[in-house]
């Protein structure tokens, strides 16, 4: 709001408090100027002089009022600056909330990806267990076969004599081959078991790390939610304050318009009573008030003189 608007508004309020309804009462109370045309001209000049003194006093008051309005205008400009700062703060905070929402969405996507990876590792672990069970079953079968072969050791010696084996070392070589196969199978089974144990350990560590990350993300989300709630409460509060300021400004603007209309009506009545053409603009409320004040002062002076004259005539 500019200084001119503030000055007109407070000036209207000032004269409304100073005079108020007394303007209309004085206009109704004083007789028509034409009916008092027989007042002594000398006394009228003296009253004019007194009115001039009163006018100078009013000018001093108006200067003091002008200084007060300048101070109020500075305060109003400071409020405007604070309002702009508040808007900038709200805009930055909305941008901050939007960025945090994007971070939260990325965190949720990452958590979903980690859970999917966890399910994949569990499936791999189940598959490794199945392979381990198959290796153990194969190992059991080979052990049974080995025992069966041991039972027929002596039989094999006899078989050498009556079989394709020409020497016993051929049977032993065959036995060593079977032992080597058994060893390879046992080693494969052990490597499979170790692989399963390592996979279990990695899975346990991975699950523990991801549980910690999920807990941290949940704590961060809770903290951001609290900040968002506080910020939303602040936004609602300042929106309410801004609406109140706008409503107050609208009411004061309406009141100022009403006062200007009343001042214009009084000015037109005064101009009609004076029967003089004036060059005062319809928008110049200050000059209108000055002329109204001068007219009221003149009427007051005339009325006082008339009363004195009537009292003197009554005494005579």
UniProtKB/Swiss-Prot annotation:
Coiled coil: 43-150, 182-236
Entry's localization field: Cytoplasm, Perinuclear region; Cytoplasm, Cytoskeleton; Cell projection, Cilium, Flagellum; Cytoplasm, Cytoskeleton, Microtubule organizing center, Centrosome
Example of a GO cellular component annotation carried by this entry: centrosome
Phenotype seen when the gene is deleted: Mice develop normally without obvious somatic defects but males are sterile due to malformation of the sperm flagella. Sperm cells display defects in the number and location of the head-tail coupling apparatus and lack flagellated sperm.
One Pfam family of this chain: DUF4200
Disulfide bond sites: none
A biological process from GO: spermatid development
Tissue expression pattern: Expressed in the brain. Expressed in the epididydmis and testis. Expression in the testis appears limited to adluminal spermatids that are engaged in the assembly of flagella. Strong expression is observed in the spermatids within the lumen of the seminiferous tubules in testis from 8-week-old mice, but not in cells adjacent to the basement membrane of the tubule, including Sertoli cells, spermatogonia and spermatocytes. Expressed in spleen but not in kidney. One study did not detect expression in the ovary. However, expression in the ovary was detected in another study.
Protein family according to the UniProt entry: Belongs to the CFAP73 family.
Function: Essential for male fertility. Required for sperm development.
Subunit structure: Interacts with ODF1 and ODF2. Interacts with CCDC38. Interacts with CCDC146. Interacts with CFAP53.
Protein name, as recorded: Coiled-coil domain-containing protein 42
Organism: Mus musculus (Mouse)
Gene (UniProt): Ccdc42
């Amino acid at each position: 709001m500019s200084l001119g608007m503030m000055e007109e508004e407070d000036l209207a309020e000032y004269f409304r408090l100073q005079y108020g309804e007394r303007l209309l009462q004085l206009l109704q109370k004083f007789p028509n100027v034409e009916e008092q045309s027989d007042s002594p001209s000398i006394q009228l000049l003296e009253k004019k002089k007194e009115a001039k003194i009163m006018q100078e006093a009013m000018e001093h008051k108006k200067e003091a009022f002008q200084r007060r309005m300048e101070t109020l205008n500075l305060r109003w400009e400071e409020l405007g600056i604070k309002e702009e700062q508040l808007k900038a703060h709200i805009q930055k905070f909305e941008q901050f909330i939007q960025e945090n929402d994007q971070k939260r969405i990325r965190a949720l996507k990452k958590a979903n990806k980690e859970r999917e990876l966890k399910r994949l590792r569990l499936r791999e672990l189940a598959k490794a267990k199945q392979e381990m069970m198959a290796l153990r079953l194969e190992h059991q079968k080979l052990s049974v076969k080995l025992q069966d072969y041991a039972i027929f050791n002596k039989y094999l010696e006899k078989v050498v004599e009556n079989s394709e084996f020409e020497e016993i070392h051929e049977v032993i070589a065959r036995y060593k081959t079977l032992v080597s196969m058994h060893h390879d199978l046992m080693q494969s089974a052990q490597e499979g078991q170790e692989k399963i144990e390592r996979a279990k350990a990695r899975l346990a560590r991975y699950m523990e790390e991801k549980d910690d990350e999920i807990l941290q993300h949940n704590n961060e989300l809770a903290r951001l939610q609290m900040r968002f709630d506080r910020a939303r409460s602040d936004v609602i509060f300042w929106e309410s304050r801004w609406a109140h300021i706008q409503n107050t400004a609208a009411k004061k603007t309406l009141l100022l318009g009403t006062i200007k209309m009343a001042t214009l009506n009084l000015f037109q009545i005064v101009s009609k009573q004076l029967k003089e053409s004036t060059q005062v603009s319809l928008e110049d409320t200050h000059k209108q008030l000055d002329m109204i004040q001068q007219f009221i002062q003149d009427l007051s002076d005339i009325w006082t003189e008339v009363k004195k004259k009537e009292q003197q005539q009554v005494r005579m």
